[in-house]
Amino acid sequence: MAKVLVLYYSAYGHIEKMAYAVAEGAESAGAEVSVKRVPELVSEEVAKASHYKIDQPAPVATVEELGDYDAIIFGAGTRYGTVASQLRNFIDQTGSLWAKGKLVGKVGSAFTSSATQHGGQESTILGLIPTMLHHGMVVVGLPYAFQGQMGIDEIKGGSPYGASTITGGDGSRQPSEIELDAARFQGAHVARIAAKLAD
């Protein structure tokens, strides 16, 4: 059984919802799944003033534990075409894991969100891939086997690089069912590959 970590940062709850959908998919494929978040970098005062969703039940991860998993699925919103600094800051602390090769051969994957359809979803996930490769991880995306990517009948996130959701400029749009299905598919896809590699 593969051990999968869904590691996320979510300011307003969109990525949190996607993270639990990813976890649901991984569990459906037989994985043992942990959902954890990275630490917030802004003060509680600023978070409250900005209406961040601060009541997230997922525990905060530690860098040291990342090597305990067969797969890590990273999730964070897009900030000006790149990953939110909270996740980037956490990842930038993994030098000791890199030095010991703790993530070599593990599966890495990512999902994201943006305010608009062309708000940097692909560039955000693509920006995470070099980090995974530097760690020696096996990168897995969201293949077109997930047919939900193919239609143009509704606004939706998702690409071969990973699942995503579009929040709207004011954050009022929540992940749609097809976006959550994409997240579930990606979680299951990662879990199956991780199980094969862990054998």
UniProtKB/Swiss-Prot annotation:
<feature type="binding site">
    <location>
        <begin position="78"/>
        <end position="80"/>
    </location>
    <ligand>
        <name>FMN</name>
    </ligand>
</feature>
<keyword id="KW-0560">Oxidoreductase</keyword>
<keyword id="KW-0288">FMN</keyword>
<feature type="binding site">
    <location>
        <begin position="113"/>
        <end position="119"/>
    </location>
    <ligand>
        <name>FMN</name>
    </ligand>
</feature>
<dbReference type="InterPro" id="IPR037513">
    <property type="entry name" value="NQO"/>
</dbReference>
<dbReference type="GO" id="GO:0010181">
    <property type="term" value="F:FMN binding"/>
</dbReference>
<dbReference type="InterPro" id="IPR005025">
    <property type="entry name" value="FMN_Rdtase-like_dom"/>
</dbReference>
<keyword id="KW-0521">NADP</keyword>
<feature type="binding site">
    <location>
        <position position="12"/>
    </location>
    <ligand>
        <name>NAD(+)</name>
    </ligand>
</feature>
<feature type="domain" description="Flavodoxin-like">
    <location>
        <begin position="4"/>
        <end position="190"/>
    </location>
</feature>
<dbReference type="InterPro" id="IPR010089">
    <property type="entry name" value="Flavoprotein_WrbA-like"/>
</dbReference>
<dbReference type="GO" id="GO:0008753">
    <property type="term" value="F:NADPH dehydrogenase (quinone) activity"/>
</dbReference>
<keyword id="KW-0547">Nucleotide-binding</keyword>
<dbReference type="GO" id="GO:0016020">
    <property type="term" value="C:membrane"/>
</dbReference>
<keyword id="KW-0285">Flavoprotein</keyword>
<dbReference type="InterPro" id="IPR008254">
    <property type="entry name" value="Flavodoxin/NO_synth"/>
</dbReference>
<dbReference type="GO" id="GO:0051287">
    <property type="term" value="F:NAD binding"/>
</dbReference>
<feature type="binding site">
    <location>
        <begin position="10"/>
        <end position="15"/>
    </location>
    <ligand>
        <name>FMN</name>
    </ligand>
</feature>
<comment type="similarity">
    <text>Belongs to the WrbA family.</text>
</comment>
<feature type="binding site">
    <location>
        <position position="98"/>
    </location>
    <ligand>
        <name>substrate</name>
    </ligand>
</feature>
<dbReference type="GO" id="GO:0050136">
    <property type="term" value="F:NADH:ubiquinone reductase (non-electrogenic) activity"/>
</dbReference>
<dbReference type="GO" id="GO:0050660">
    <property type="term" value="F:flavin adenine dinucleotide binding"/>
</dbReference>
<protein>
    <recommendedName>
        <fullName>NAD(P)H dehydrogenase (quinone)</fullName>
        <ecNumber>1.6.5.2</ecNumber>
    </recommendedName>
</protein>
<dbReference type="InterPro" id="IPR029039">
    <property type="entry name" value="Flavoprotein-like_sf"/>
</dbReference>
<dbReference type="GO" id="GO:0050661">
    <property type="term" value="F:NADP binding"/>
</dbReference>
<feature type="binding site">
    <location>
        <position position="134"/>
    </location>
    <ligand>
        <name>FMN</name>
    </ligand>
</feature>
<dbReference type="Pfam" id="PF03358">
    <property type="entry name" value="FMN_red"/>
</dbReference>
<keyword id="KW-0520">NAD</keyword>
